[in-house]
């Protein structure tokens, strides 16, 4: 039997309060202070070895009432309404396969399964793999006309069991899994022409995906993009591999930096139903509208509306202008026709379009109207209803909060995630709005479990009859299944009760989510507070920063990470702050750093920390800052500001000069590095220009030598500037590690090294 105070501590472990937290009363009761609490802390080893594992429930919808879920290596088919299941594929199938299966994919008609193995990672999303097709009716692998090894991407058709795949940068289609492949494109060339897959910059910054293939709803057509990197400059770096390699390999990637030549883009649609073994496919090109074709441009969204209507969104290189082009198929000519009357322009006068790109449209079933998230007159992202043949739209949501995403659209309701509830930007809840009366809005998640759950995502069945709610915090993750007819909970899928039980025997930190005022505006922060936090004591503080455009660090998500260790074992407060430039609070805040990266977002981190140091429980002689990527840049700019607020800091894989970073990301916020545009802001925002001020702080600079994203060049130039300025600093590189420094040994090493540096800075050794 649990003692009452232990029960409450267990609740604290799963529900770090996401309100203004003072010292929880439970921690002040008899027998519950640091001197008498014999429970263990959450250690660095716990984080590195993932001792305490959160459970997830990753289902895959295969109809409007059924989903697949992998359990004990069996693939089970569940009925959503009743919860009963049957074995869809036995674990013995995997055991007999002879390869280590990385993933699987079931054809829409459930006749075949695609097994993925020999997975080889390339960049953030891209990889190559081998594939075999399993016939579910015959319960055997298909051995004829197999998919080639090192396939770059593969996808089932929307219906039936056709396959489209990319190999050696060209597209192939199989009408039947055991039929010969038909080649769709013939122009593919490594690192030059990409058909059906993205090049580096489109993968990283535009589509956040490797695939550039889109099946039509009934699989009559296959749309694809072609990227031409012929003129794109190459980034080159050494890859050292194992010590037996006498000369390092040289990795070369077409990588457009700010102001450099960009890839060009073409878009095609091919009629798959017209394919025959003796006739090569004819692809019809859809040319962008003239308003973007006149200069450099991007394809940023592809959405099939109906079987014979497709929506494309194009973006100018200066990303404050986008245009949606809705094209119809002309059966008489076999061409796709664009009409000015079906084009929709989106312009930003204060920054850039969308959060990172224009939002995707959600079309009604007849294809004659759509809903899309755009900025309203007040600068908040809300849902607007468009007719396809009219320019103006009607906003169906409003307020000083933002819609995060549209999740489902039926004939009666639109479902969306927003941060409206209680005015907390770092929360997420599911809402539905009645389409025949926009005043009828219901929050489906706000009051379900408000202490434990304030940050939700959702997964809908194919026609939105059922949905899975995924609660990510502030308590332990919780997965539940609901019927959309009445929105009642059908069952709990995973509640992490085992982890809850284990964490009751661990001294866990608590989480504070609150706001301060800067420049007359409310800005949010979070603090991970040590166990038995006592506001009358003084604690060292680590500011964990990202601070990139549209970022958010103060949120209601439960995490077990490095900060958990630092707070639990080392009694360090770990804080994060969302200042100017951060997202989900309106364009006024987000666009404040437009064309001036390295300014306000840096200043606000310093000023927020000054306010933290005045709260009475922060030791102002022991304040540090750390960040990764953009966070490494802001860390370095903060330390180089000479504010006197910070004693030390750690920058991992930082940007140091925006002219070194990729064109799509950088120019979105900074424009072009030319005298006619914004060269002065580029030159005034480098870390190197602040080298002299690093004499006042302790600095640890870390980078992976095979970082394809933020190149080692960035840290090399910081190092050179610091050496030239006579600054004593520490540095660590990780051989052949990319931007994530995620290999098992490197991951353990970097966090051990950073922990030692921080403890030394705070005199905790």
Swiss-Prot record:
| A GO CC term attached to the entry | anchoring junction
How does this protein lie in the membrane?
A: Single-pass type II membrane protein
PROSITE patterns the record matches:
PRO_ENDOPEP_SER
Compartments annotated for it: namely: Cell membrane; Apical cell membrane; Cell projection, Invadopodium membrane; Cell projection, Lamellipodium membrane
GO molecular function ontology, one term from the record: signaling receptor binding
Which UniProt keywords are given for this protein, alphabetically ordered?
Answer: Aminopeptidase, Cell adhesion, Cell junction, Cell membrane, Cell projection, Disulfide bond, Glycoprotein, Hydrolase, Membrane, Protease, Receptor, Secreted, Serine protease, Signal-anchor, Transmembrane, Transmembrane helix
Q: In which tissues is it expressed?
A: Intestinal epithelium, dendritic cells and several immune system tissues.
One of the protein's GO biological processes: endothelial cell migration
Kindly identify the residues recorded as the active site: 629, 707, 739
Q: Which residues are glycosylated?
A: 84, 91, 149, 218, 228, 271, 280, 320, 392, 495, 684
Q: Which residues lie on this side of the membrane: Cytoplasmic?
A: 1-6
Q: Which residues lie on this side of the membrane: Extracellular?
A: 30-765
Supply the EC number(s).
3.4.14.5
Chief localization: membrane
User: What job does the chain carry out?
Assistant: Cell surface glycoprotein receptor involved in the costimulatory signal essential for T-cell receptor (TCR)-mediated T-cell activation. Acts as a positive regulator of T-cell coactivation, by binding at least ADA, CAV1, IGF2R, and PTPRC. Its binding to CAV1 and CARD11 induces T-cell proliferation and NF-kappa-B activation in a T-cell receptor/CD3-dependent manner. Its interaction with ADA also regulates lymphocyte-epithelial cell adhesion.
- Summary of subunit composition and partner proteins: Monomer. Homodimer. Heterodimer with Seprase (FAP). Requires homodimerization for optimal dipeptidyl peptidase activity and T-cell costimulation. Found in a membrane raft complex, at least composed of BCL10, CARD11, DPP4 and IKBKB. Associates with collagen. Interacts with PTPRC; the interaction is enhanced in an interleukin-12-dependent manner in activated lymphocytes. Interacts (via extracellular domain) with ADA; does not inhibit its dipeptidyl peptidase activity. Interacts with CAV1 (via the N-terminus); the interaction is direct.
Entry protein name: Dipeptidyl peptidase 4
